[in-house]
Structures are given as C-alpha cells and as structure tokens.
C-alpha cells in the first residue's frame, strides 16, 4: 500500500489532489464518456443529452413527494414543478457562463458555448420531463 500513497514529487509540503481512485485509467475512461467531456459534440447536443436525462428523473420526486401527491393532478403538478426547476437551473447555467468565460475561447469554454449548452439543456429537460409525464399518465 505504501507504493500507492506517496507525497507529490516526494515533497510532503506540496498539496496535490490526485488519489489512486480519481487518477486511475478506469475513472478517466468513464468520465471521458460523459456528455460534457465528449469530444466532437456541439455544446447544444451536449446540453440536449444532459437535459433529457435530468428532465426525465426530476419529475419523480415532485410527483411522489410534492404537496399534491394525493390528488388527481399529481402528475401535472409534478411536470409543472419540474419545468419550474429546469428554468431556474437554466438561468443559473446562463449566469455561470456569462461571468466565467469570455467569447475568445473555444467550443464550450466561451459565453456562446455555455449559452448553447443551456439552451440545449432547457429543450432536452423539458422534453425529458414531458416524456416522463406521458409515461406516468399512460401507465398508471
């Protein structure tokens, strides 16, 4: 075990965040397949894919745990609540991109890239939540 845990550059006074877990090739291969890190994909399509997954699973907690969970409109209330949260998340993404990046960068590391990512996220998340709503209403 002493072979794995060593000070960075054999200097115990230098901080380094690499561990055997987060610097392993398996972890790096897994993370490289996530949509945000995938090469050759436009920011809009990255946001669309991320949004579809998030919109699909955001409706469930609002349906099961929301204040209207014992009524006939629990699915509609869950859908509208999820869409409200999605809009708030999209505004947060837009603000983050506006204050963190400039327009002279490349691809996702620019204001325009984050604007595309956020618009794809909004479209995908509303679509994912709508798809989950349709499944819930059809199969319940």
UniProtKB/Swiss-Prot annotation:
Membrane-protein topology: Multi-pass membrane protein
Key words of the record: Chloroplast, Membrane, Photosynthesis, Photosystem I, Plastid, Thylakoid, Transmembrane, Transmembrane helix
One GO process term, biological-process aspect: photosynthesis
Keyword match Thylakoid: yes
Compartments in which it is found: Plastid, Chloroplast thylakoid membrane
Entry-linked InterPro entries: PSI_PsaL, PSI_PsaL_sf, PSI_suXI
This protein's GO CC annotations: chloroplast thylakoid membrane; photosystem I reaction center
Transmembrane residue ranges: 48-68, 79-99, 119-139
A Pfam family recorded for this sequence: PsaL
Record-stated family: Belongs to the PsaL family.
Name the UniProt record assigns to this protein: Photosystem I reaction center subunit XI
């Amino acid at each position: 075990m002493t072979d794995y845990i060593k000070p960075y550059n054999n200097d115990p006074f230098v901080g380094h965040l690499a561990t055997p877990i987060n610097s392993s090739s398996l972890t790096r291969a897994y993370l490289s397949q996530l949509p945000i890190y995938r090469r050759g994909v436009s920011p809009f399509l990255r946001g669309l894919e991320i949004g579809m997954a998030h919109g699909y699973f955001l409706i469930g907690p609002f349906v099961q745990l929301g204040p209207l969970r014992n009524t006939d409109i629990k699915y509609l209330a869950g859908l509208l609540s999820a869409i409200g949260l999605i809009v708030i998340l999209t505004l947060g993404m837009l603000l983050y991109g506006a204050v963190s990046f400039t327009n002279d960068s490349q691809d996702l590391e620019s204001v325009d890239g984050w604007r595309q990512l956020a618009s794809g996220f909004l479209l995908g998340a509303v679509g994912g939540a709508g798809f989950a709503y349709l499944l819930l209403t059809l199969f319940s």
